[in-house]
Swiss-Prot record:
Gene3D superfamilies: Jelly Rolls, Winged helix-like DNA-binding domain superfamily/Winged helix DNA-binding domain. It comes from Haemophilus influenzae (strain ATCC 51907 / DSM 11121 / KW20 / Rd). It comes from the Bacteria. One of its GO terms (biological process) is establishment of competence for transformation. Disruption phenotype: Loss of competence, the ability to bind, take-up and integrate exogenous DNA. Loss of the ability to ferment ribose or xylose. One of its GO terms (cellular component) is cytosol. GO terms for molecular function: cAMP binding; DNA binding; DNA-binding transcription factor activity. This is cAMP-activated global transcriptional regulator CRP. Residues 194-200 bind DNA. 3',5'-cyclic AMP 2 binds at A150, F151, Q185, E186, I187, G188, Q189, M190, V191, G192, C193, S194, R195.
Length: 224
């Protein structure tokens, strides 16, 4: 287990990089968007509704999730500043939303209709590269997640999830690593296990001096 938190450094850090490396083309794109501010826990996308709009996170973070027929929620990912979402309908005209998207924190979101975005592509095809580059990285991350589900035990999945979260923009620098805020239930929804199991694994990681947990606050030692 001691290697699981140190060997996971290849996971997603793109949202941090993109948030601090704004490109002039991206700034041009944002001038054509409608900008909105949302409080935490606002629902931006409902699964099953028509897909007509592309979103871009300027500040804050959002949670992407799905629900089974019984209403049980599974957290698919968190997206932070510099990330697009709601793009599937852009390539599959007439499709319905397949997931729920809610703000995790207070957010500033840029929104643009698919029709307008396609017009921008005609004016400057480079704007499409921002989106396709992210989609390529997400596909890699999804492949990694599937591999983890197949080969890592639940303790390994939780350890990797904590390291992933420690690399998100809203994670706070701590003298011993990075500090995150997340509930046991949310972790369970991300890795596919019960809240009680998460609690036991968190305690085990603490005993191994890999993390420190107090309520929703978790310090991941050695993460930067």
């Amino acid at each position: 287990m001691s290697n699981e938190l140190t060997e996971i450094d290849e996971v997603v850090t793109s949202s941090q990089e993109e948030a601090t490396q704004r490109d002039p083309v991206l700034d041009w794109f944002l001038t054509h968007c409608h900008l909105h501010k949302y409080p935490a826990k606002s629902t931006l996308i409902h699964a099953g509704e028509d897909a007509t709009t592309l979103y871009y996170v300027i500040k804050g973070s959002v949670m992407v999730s799905s629900k089974d027929d019984e209403g049980k929620e599974m957290i698919l990912t968190y997206l932070g500043a510099g990330q697009f979402f709601g793009e599937a309908g852009l390539f599959d005209e007439g499709s319905k939303r397949s997931a729920w998207v809610k703000t995790k924190t207070t957010c500033e979101i840029a929104e643009i209709s698919y029709k307008k975005y396609r017009q921008l592509i005609q004016a400057n095809p480079e704007i499409l590269m921002f989106l396709t580059a992210q989609l390529a990285r997400r596909l890699q991350n999804t492949s990694r997640q599937v591999t983890n589900l197949a080969f890592l035990d639940v303790a390994g999945r939780i350890a990797q999830t904590l390291m992933n979260l420690a690399k998100q923009p809203e994670a706070m620098t701590h003298p011993d690593g990075m500090q995150i805020k997340i509930t046991r239930q949310e972790i369970g929804q991300m890795v596919g296990c019960s809240r009680e199991t998460v609690g036991r694994i968190i305690k085990m990681l603490e005993d191994q001096n890999l993390i420190h947990a107090h309520g929703k606050t978790i310090v991941v030692y050695g993460a930067r």
